[in-house]
């Protein structure tokens, strides 16, 4: 038998061989090719039939559920006690459906399509100013006019209270309402009536709306030691050209190293991210690959141009609000060992959306794929897909992430965003600073009002990098805070109150009352003492607000660099060539 088998192996090359294992032995089976072909055709036919049936079942489910939705709405419209607004009811249904998927798949009714366009392009027609709701005045105020925009050109100032737009009163409206009226068609004119707190006078401004492009690159400049610095806010159309111009200009000024700041950059255009990476890596390098359910969603993006500089040392700054296209940029530069990533772990948005035109001038922004950077990893941090236990939207645990390798062999991981090569946490903002700032929901606006008053008393200040508040100025601010009656509850006090409630519910409060009283007395705060305790950060916040009012975003960023702990570490690394090179080499294993 063995000889016959051996002979067959040599002579009958048209036979296929299959190995069958059974218990403790293996048997070689020789199957004629025509029989195997018949088997394959049969298997293929079965697979096709199963696929067709599965698709048929899916289509039936779609039709069934659309019919159910249609019948539900028809009965609501026919029988519900009140008359329904079709657009509102169906729109609510659509948005509820999309909420079950991910936060990036969104429906835009006709009234909101301009918002989508602004998000995609960074452009809108309006006056070019940041506004916010003043908690004390209970009105919308001008917060920050943008440099070179209509608001700044006509003379609007920080603190001006919006009273009316043409004949429409704005005194009892929220930010969204006022913003929608400030925007309009480019070239359209309107009259804005404001109240200027410093004089108590009402003033009319005739304004012509213009196309406003949000400043995606608010500042770039030279730092100590021939190090260039570029700050990018978002990845809108054309931003790669702006970054290229800034980088070339910095090289002309003598930059021999670069800090590229992507902190709090929420992303934007994927192609712009590829073109920015292209500044520092060679042509024809794959930067990102999209993979989706349908073939049209699959695409690999490569660098298209000759680079500007492939050798200059580069540090990219990131934080927890660095997302999407920012993560493509920082992740690709990390995977290609072209830059040191410094800061804190990024947001972790590895999903790609496309805008789709829908009937009746509506739009749908739809997640169609995940993106994968050069090492092959996807950095999506949250799993939005429902699992078998009914849970969803769970952050990928570090223990479930997978190891990938950079071009030089450094270990990196997928899931959970981009982990920096050098982790540096910025100092946290104390509770009192949050409640004093205008961003706090229940802010007394005392900090905002003091800054507005300072601006009115000082028609000019020193250059951005040189300006500092005097001791007398800060003391005046502290007295204003104390006299305003400002108070706040530290987190520790709130947690103590929760602990008291729990102790009472469980019956332990009375026996522990003395301990609670002692702890409460220790946690009491004095506002004046707290202002002194946190004077450094409060002084910085005041100075940056004032500088931004005089020198716009560029001035505020420039002045803030002197306080930037992460930037200082980036500069130190760039000034240490051996440490920089070591960070880009794989770690030696024992």
Feature annotation, model-predicted:
Residues 80-141, 187-209, 214-219, 561-571, ...:
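Extended, small/polar residue-biased N-terminal targeting/export presequences
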Residues 53-65, 69-86, 141-145, 149-158, ...:
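Cleft-lining beta-strand/loop regions that shape enzyme active-site pockets
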Residues 127, 306, 365-367:
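A structural signal for short loop-to-beta-strand junctions that line the ligand-binding cleft
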Residues 1, 5, 9, 13-59:
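Bacterial Sec-dependent N-terminal signal peptides
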Residues 325, 337, 342-344, 348-410, ...:
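Polar, glycine-rich mid-to-C-terminal structural blocks
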Residues 107, 287, 301, 379, ...:
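Short clusters of hydrophobic/aromatic residues that line enzyme substrate/ligand-binding pockets
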Residues 378-590:
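Conserved functional hotspot residues or short segments at active or partner-binding sites
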């Amino acid at each position: 038998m063995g000889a016959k088998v051996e002979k067959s192996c040599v002579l009958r090359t048209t036979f296929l061989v299959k190995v069958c294992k059974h218990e403790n032995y293996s048997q070689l089976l020789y199957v004629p090719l025509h029989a195997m072909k018949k088997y394959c055709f049969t298997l293929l036919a079965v697979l096709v039939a199963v696929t067709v049936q599965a698709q048929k079942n899916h289509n039936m489910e779609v039709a069934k559920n659309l019919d159910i939705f249609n019948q539900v709405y028809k009965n609501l419209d026919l029988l519900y006690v009140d008359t329904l607004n079709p657009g509102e009811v169906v729109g609510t249904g659509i948005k509820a459906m999309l909420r079950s998927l991910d936060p990036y798949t969104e429906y835009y009714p006709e009234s909101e399509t301009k918002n989508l366009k602004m998000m995609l392009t960074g452009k809108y027609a309006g006056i070019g100013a940041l506004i916010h709701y003043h908690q004390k005045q209970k009105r919308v105020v001008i917060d920050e006019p943008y440099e070179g925009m209509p608001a700044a050109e006509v003379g609007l100032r920080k603190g001006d209270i919006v009273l009316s737009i043409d004949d429409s009163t704005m005194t009892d409206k929220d930010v969204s309402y006022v913003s929608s009226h400030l925007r309009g068609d480019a070239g359209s004119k309107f009259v804005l009536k404001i109240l200027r707190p410093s004089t108590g006078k009402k003033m009319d401004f005739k304004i012509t709306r213009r196309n406003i492009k949000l400043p995606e690159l608010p500042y770039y400049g030279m730092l100590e030691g021939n190090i260039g610095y570029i700050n990018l806010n978002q990845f809108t159309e054309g931003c790669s050209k702006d970054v290229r111009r800034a980088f070339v200009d910095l090289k002309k000024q003598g930059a021999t190293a670069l800090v590229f700041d992507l902190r709090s950059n929420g992303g934007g255009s994927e192609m712009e991210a590829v073109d920015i990476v292209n500044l520092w890596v060679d042509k024809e390098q794959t930067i990102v690959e999209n993979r989706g359910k349908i073939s049209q969603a699959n695409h690999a993006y490569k660098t298209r141009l000759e680079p500007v500089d492939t050798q200059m040392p580069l540090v990219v700054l990131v934080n927890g609000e660095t997302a999407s296209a920012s993560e493509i940029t920082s992740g690709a530069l990390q995977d290609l060992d072209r830059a040191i990533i410094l800061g804190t772990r990024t947001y972790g948005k590895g999903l790609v959306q496309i805008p789709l035109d829908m009937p009746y001038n509506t739009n749908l922004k739809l997640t169609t794929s995940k993106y994968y950077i050069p090492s092959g990893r996807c950095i999506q941090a949250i799993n939005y897909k429902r699992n078998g236990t009914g849970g969803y939207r769970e952050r990928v645990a570090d223990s479930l992430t997978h190891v990938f390798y950079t071009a030089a062999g450094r270990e990196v991981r997928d899931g959970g965003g981009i982990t920096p090569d050098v982790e540096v946490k910025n100092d946290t903002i104390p509770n009192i600073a949050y409640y004093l700032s205008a961003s706090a929901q229940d802010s007394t606006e005392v900090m905002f009002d003091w800054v507005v008053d300072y601006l009115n008393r000082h028609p000019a200040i020193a250059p951005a990098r040189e300006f500092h508040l005097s001791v007398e100025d800060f003391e005046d601010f502290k007295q204003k805070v104390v006299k305003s009656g400002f108070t706040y509850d530290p987190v520790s006090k709130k947690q103590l109150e929760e602990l008291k409630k729990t102790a009472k519910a469980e019956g332990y409060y009375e026996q522990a009352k003395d301990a609670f009283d002692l702890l409460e007395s220790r946690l009491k705060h004095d506002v004046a003492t707290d202002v002194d305790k946190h004077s450094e950060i409060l002084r910085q916040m005041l100075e940056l607000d004032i500088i931004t009012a005089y020198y716009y975003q560029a001035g505020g960023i420039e002045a803030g660099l002197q306080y930037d702990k992460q930037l200082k570490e980036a500069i130190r690394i760039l000034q240490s060539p051996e440490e920089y090179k070591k960070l880009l080499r794989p770690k030696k294993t024992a």
